[in-house]
Amino acid sequence: MRCPFCGHMESQVKDSRPSEDGAAIRRRRLCPECGGRFTTFERVQLRELTIVKRSGRRSPFDREKLVRSISIATRKRPVDPERVERMVNGIVRQLESQGETELPSSAVGEMVMKALKSLDDVAYVRYASVYRDFRETSDFAKFLGAEGLSDVADDEL
């Protein structure tokens, strides 16, 4: 594997063990060129997934993009990163088990919303505000009212 520090094409595996949730193999590596140490994760990929965007454009499913979007929603919240990782693993498993190679981005978004709702209400609302493209405070009020998360009426904003 290429060293992320110096770009050398080979590295040595110094330690290998399953991750805590058993969904990946964690490997500690050493670059013989620069001495840099880094960690890699190896995961099973059942099939290549393609996400169909709202615009109709297609792009390969990017697990790290999913992790980043959820991490942004949970930032500065009392949510354990391991719970986020388990949640992402569950969403990926659901996507792969659907048997489809092309999935609409809305399916991914709805799965994330459902998972975040059970994880943290604030993270759920943060994610929804981007996913549902809230433009005004009234959009938040309508969403919170529909979800039963608030008694705020539109005229109180």
UniProtKB/Swiss-Prot annotation:
The record's listing under PROSITE patterns reads: ATP_CONE
Q: Which GO terms describe its biological process?
A: negative regulation of DNA-templated transcription
| This protein's record includes keyword Ribonucleoprotein | no
CC cofactor note:
Binds 1 zinc ion.
Q: Which UniProt keywords apply?
A: ATP-binding, DNA-binding, Metal-binding, Nucleotide-binding, Repressor, Transcription, Transcription regulation, Zinc, Zinc-finger
ZnF (unnamed) ranges: 3-34
Family named by the database record: Belongs to the NrdR family.
Q: Which HAMAP family match?
A: NrdR (MF_00440)
Protein's name according to its UniProt entry = Transcriptional repressor NrdR
Native species: Caulobacter sp. (strain K31)
